[in-house]
Amino acid sequence: MQTTRRTFLSAVGAAAALGAAGGAKIPESLAAEPRAANVPASSSEKVLFWVAACTPCDKNLKFDEELYKDLLAYLKANGADGVVVLGTTGEFPSFSVTERKKVAETAFKHRNGLNIIVSPGTTNFPETLELSLHAEANGADGLLVVPPFYYRRPRLDGLTKYFSMLFEQVKIPINLYHIPFATGVPISHELMHAMEKYPNLTGIKDSVSDPKVYQDFVAEFPKLNMRTGTTENLKYALDHNMGAILAEGNNFTKQIAAVFDAKRAGKDLTETVAKLEAALKLLRAGGVDEYGPMKYALSLQMGTRQFYQRPPNSDVTDEQKTKIKEALEQIKQMG
């Protein structure tokens, strides 16, 4: 996982009870007022904020459906337009195909107006297609598809055939996922151009922090939604009427939503982006750069029992817990 980009919503109270009983409702003090009017959540709407949602497990490392329901409600209440289900932050490689279907079905059941993009990618085409068709049949608004990984440097013709097979069998909007530091397989401009013949090519998620890489994507494909996956490129994305899919949205839903609200209101983004970056810096310094600490911080923010993750991702340490609580308190003082 890239530097795990999470932190805190300004409405968060001080450290909430970790031992809250299962399926706790969102504390009223943490739930932001819904927007006066929902932003259209169609896949053709570009300037939307998707959270790359984490996937909570219980202490026995089973998918925690109740906590996931609470998480979706929390993200919606604090301003998210949509979520990506089982992306990198959602730990998709840690779940079986059957489990991934259950997680997606839980999201569909409790979407409450959220735009839902499912990440169905695997190392092989049959399972990727199976998960894609399942998402399509159950009401997904779109897909975010990672390239097949493990094989070293597959050629353009092989990747073109792989994605063409998918586009020819799935009709909902499809976005390609550029995260080469994790997959070893970049999404090239040539591959994107090869897919442009399919009308349901919607765009990408670019999770590379390099501004030039992202800016080149935007310049080359201005009609598609070239969503940024990093806060470093957020202002540039919004300045060019593109969306974002952000892992930081788990812990910073409200702050990121404020940036999008400023964009929609035609306001200058400098102040809201600076406030977001300051809060991000504090929690990152507090140790939230792994799944365990990120999920621990989120459980404090939501006031629920602890979110767990599966190995090989490590549990949060006592030292990290202390630092996270201190960072959350500092962020609270920022207002």
Regions found by a protein language model. Name each.
Residues 16-18, 238-335:
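Structured C-terminal cap/extension of enzyme domains
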Residues 34-43:
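N-terminal carbohydrate-binding accessory modules
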Residues 42-50, 56-57, 62-184:
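Active-site beta->alpha loop and helix N-cap motifs at the rims of alpha/beta catalytic domains
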Residues 13, 54, 88, 148, ...:
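Flexible loop residues that form catalytic
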Residues 24-35:
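Signal peptide processing junction and immediate N-terminal pro/mature segment
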Residues 182-277, 283-287:
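Catalytic alpha/beta core domains of metabolic enzymes, predominantly
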Residues 102, 106-110, 134, 138, ...:
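Alpha-helical structural signal in soluble globular domains
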